[in-house]
Amino acid sequence: MNQVIHGNSLEIIKVIEDESIHLILSDIPYGISFEDWDVLHHNTNSALLGSSPAQEKAGKVFKKRGKPLNGWSEADKKIPKEYYEWCSKWAGDWLRVLKPGGSVFVFAGRRLAHRCIAAMEDAGFIYKDMICWEKETAPHRAQRVSLVYERRGDQENAEKWEGWRLGNLRPLFEPILWFMKPYKIGGTLADNIVEHGVGAYNYIEWSKYNSLTSNMIKVTSNSNDHRKHPTQKPVALMESLIKLTTQEGQIVLDPFCGSGSTLVAAKKLKRNYIG
């Protein structure tokens, strides 16, 4: 309790007691190959591997930018299924350790969130909602098509495709998937709340972030967050989700705790934590 355990999350979670956790809050790997630790599949796409003709000419300039991640070539078609299979490896244990009525918040990439949802539902969770985290800024890695042709010396196509880009629109929102562990058949959710202390949400706390208590939230990082991780989430954002579904003294689990933002938030809010 109240510690960070270093090791394989898929193995360590097996020693956590059944129905002992009130909330699971985790920023899981998105499977989009943002960094080496986020590659969860076997991929032969030359651009993803940094060996496309344009990348070979440009050296390291494009190694971390403009990468086709999912469905951009026939080589990528297995990625969604492989991501589902990876999520399925831990979803069952998440269900086991969570109390009935307990919530799970999962930060998921927009491209593969549906595969995480399917894996969690197949494990036995109820998919409750998707919270939209609105961000003020976000990196935009859409490469100019005209620039590709310019580097190839193809001026005709460079002019023809001026104004077009490879990639996506600027990602100014991030989905937070909200799941719930079903309560026992024969009871009610109100009964479950009394027995297990979870199953409801605190609309008074949430209204401090969103006056309409809707499924939208806008929280930004501040100087106190001390970024230690490339995909680190603001502590204030983690606080909002913890306050939404738990009370003081309850236990928060983050199986993929990264820089520890979830645990910092839990400690600040007088919740117990495991990461």
Report residues per predicted region.
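Core catalytic lobe of class I
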Residues: 2-275
